[in-house]
């Protein structure tokens, strides 16, 4: 939901999700880089930074096109003095709809409301 927060959606998140454009079998490469940068490895897909921030890595996103296509569609926003690619609200909504967990249904209310206000 950090992508939503960066786009003005009034929600709180305790972690940052990163979609990695590699096959999932390459997760060791990602974890090795994180470890070299001082992160604590929590699981094959989660690391914790020195300041306690949790990063979640995913290698596919339900309901969306492939990484390359979505990366080209992504919005470029400023985060921590860096330009980062984030999924637009419309794409976050599509993914949340596809996953359909209880927490995703709650997030959809806020995402749709924010999108409506932006239009």
Where are these regions (language model features)?
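Compositionally biased terminal segments of proteins
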Residues: 1-119
């Amino acid at each position: 939901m950090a992508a939503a927060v960066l786009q003005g959606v009034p929600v709180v998140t305790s972690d940052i999700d990163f979609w990695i454009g590699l096959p999932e079998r390459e997760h060791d490469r990602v974890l090795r880089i994180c470890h070299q940068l001082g992160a604590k490895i929590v699981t094959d897909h989660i690391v914790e930074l020195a300041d306690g921030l949790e990063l979640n890595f995913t290698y596919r996103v339900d309901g969306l096109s492939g990484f390359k296509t979505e990366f080209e569609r992504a919005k470029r926003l400023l985060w921590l003095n860096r330009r980062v690619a984030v999924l637009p609200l419309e794409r976050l909504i599509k993914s949340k709809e596809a996953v359909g967990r209880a927490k995703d249904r709650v997030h959809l209310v806020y995402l749709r409301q924010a999108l409506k206000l932006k239009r």
